[in-house]
Swiss-Prot record:
Mn(2+) 2 binds at D151, H153, C242, D244. It holds the Pfam family Arginase. Catalyzes the conversion of N-formimidoyl-L-glutamate to L-glutamate and formamide. Its EC number is 3.5.3.8. Its cofactor is Mn(2+). It is an enzyme of class 3 (hydrolase). GO terms for biological process: L-histidine catabolic process to glutamate and formamide; L-histidine catabolic process to glutamate and formate; putrescine biosynthetic process from arginine, via agmatine. Keywords: Histidine metabolism, Hydrolase, Manganese, Metal-binding. Belongs to the arginase family. This is Formimidoylglutamase. HAMAP family: Formimidoylglutam (MF_00737). Binds 2 manganese ions per subunit. Mn(2+) 1 binds at H122, D151, D155, C242.
Amino acid sequence: MYPAPDMSLWQGRIDSQEGADARRWHQWMRPYADDAEAASVLLGFASDEGVRRNQGRQGARHGPPALRRALANLAWHGEQAIYDAGDIVAGDDLEAAQERYAQRVADLLARGHRVVGLGGGHEIAYASFAGLARHLSRHERLPRIGILNFDAHFDLRHAERASSGTPFRQIAELCQASDWPFAYCCLGISRLSNTAALFDQAQRLGVRYLLDRQLQPWNLERSEAFLDSFLQSVDHLYLTVCLDVLPAAQAPGVSAPSAHGVEMPVVEHLVRRAKASGKLRLADIAELNPQLDSDQRTARIAARLVDSLVN
């Protein structure tokens, strides 16, 4: 059994005088049930144990409810149903929580839903991919899964235990054990936030990446071509956005704010482009830390990205 979602988070303005089309997220959201029609499902991963293990600033476990509150009052422009499936809460047993989250993702995908994960630290990424891999392995022997990560960091660290700095190394090891290709594309890498050892590791693993200074409006056509080339090489896409890819002025509420970062219009444009490929199977937003946020700026940006993924 999974805990029921806290529907009290879905509150906001009601513009009934403007008619039926004046809907907002909080009016459209429904609690998930197993007999729900295939639709978008929000699933939270309330964890910052991985951030703690990675020596970061804690508070991301409060990200999922903060993100729901930011979503609640946004105007709703979709026609399809949308459901809240509640949170998987990690505590200090991160590995067990990742397994529960992965199984929940696999079950939801098997029912035909489109899952959008709400973090939580970026340790959500390994759990998300594991769930997608579990689902696809039931139907394909050798699925070509692309991992598209908007992030200032490679998150390929060596460590004795899982953390927010290890998820894509864990995914690489999972792919190797399954004899699957490891197709990892990271957009927004900060050269000053990744050691030479991490760049060497990325090269050994065949990681495709663009630096934050390359992902700028004046270079958008090249960024689009780079992304399109990656998308053409895979059959299924897992997309994850670590909010520290954005400039600190836009997203202060993260463990490791970016001095440079990638502007929100560029990130949102490329997220929508990836979604338009028709290959997107699963997505999540990671590293929202409301305890470090200012005027809900980071939560509002995260909410806009979720809306871009759903509508």
